Amino acid sequence: MGVVVAVHGAGGGGWEYELWRPVFQEAGYVFIANDLQPSPDGLAATRAEDYLDQIHSWIPQHERLILIGASMGGLLALKVAELLPPAALVLINSLPPSDVAESRPLKTYPPIIEWENGPLAETQAALFDSDETIVQWAWPRWRNESGAVLQQLHGPFPVQRPACPTLVVLGEQDHDIPYQTGLRLAQWARADLHLYAGMSHVGPLLSRRAAEVARTTLAWCQARLL
């Protein structure tokens, strides 16, 4: 069938796709969702280019590729698609390119954003549409993130409009990246759109409806790649 390469969001890991993996594997896809690693010089020295190089290394040659990215991973996936055009691209509550995002003061990030070992209440608030089992499972898995990477991605970070079939998946109750931003991204990318009412930022991947979202996304991929 082909290969799915899924890129996680800031502070997360490949584990974020744990509920999506079996849906695509049962349909015959190889599903790759690795953890992005800090550079050898440490997390504070890690740049977007380090992550992009890693994603490139995950992609097998001569395979039909579906590229998926969530949040930070969405913008990284858009950039990867410039050099290694996939057969299809899926952007989940994605950070937008700088020329698509609404104008706002540039936020300054610390060298390391500390999310590891955060309070359980923060995970419960973020995953309000997940069941308690998933909340307890996700809570110890959050990690610290490179502030420099997010600084780059929130600054001037130009990307080309994707040339392949593209799907934008949005949670209507995303409190990190408002869904209206995703609507602008979908318009810019000339993408199809799946908007889920009442769903959180991480909800497409980890909410009670995550398997449903995965199946609907799989059906879209299969229909667009006929």
Whereabouts are the PLM-identified features?
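Active-site glycine-rich loops that stabilize anionic/oxyanionic intermediates
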Residues: 9-13, 71, 172-173
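Conserved alpha/beta-hydrolase
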Residues: 21-42
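Active-site loop/oxyanion-hole signature of alpha/beta-hydrolase fold enzymes
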Residues: 36-65
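Gly/Ala-rich beta-loop-alpha elbow adjacent to hydrolase catalytic centers
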Residues: 68-73, 77
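Flexible "cap/lid" loop of the alpha/beta hydrolase fold
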Residues: 82-116, 149-156
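Short beta-strand/loop motif that positions the catalytic acidic residue
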Residues: 162, 168-170, 174
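Conserved alpha/beta-hydrolase "acid-adjacent" motif
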Residues: 175-181
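Catalytic histidine-centered segment of alpha/beta-hydrolase-like enzymes
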Residues: 199-212
